[in-house]
Amino acid sequence: MPMPKRASVDDYFAQLEDVQRPHLEDLRRMSLVAAPGAREELKWNLPVYVVDKNTNLWMLQNFTKHCSLRFSPDFFATQKAAVEAAGFDSGAGFVKLPYDRELPTDLLESLMQARLSDHEASTADQV
């Protein structure tokens, strides 16, 4: 079944299924706290947290039985071992978060902070 077209980030969250809503709303809150200067933008029909002109920090994705917090594959490769050590499945750039498990907030906040540090280091190299 194709994903419904969303008009905005708020519309994305409004269209979530009941089982999806708690995890994704928690991820949204965590994202806004971790990166207060980031903009929420709808890209690829999904919420993306963006800084500077167009740097994507991370993206939220919803699926039938899980959601994902997605980063660039290059960045996530440096974090994948910590995700797997915490007992969560991962792939090329994402941590898989089943709806029937509690969100690993410490792990997710750590990933977000690491991505922000990675971004700050990359922009410092350009100066």
Question: For each predicted feature, which ranges?
Answer:
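Charge-dense, helix-prone N-terminal extensions
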Residues: 1-127
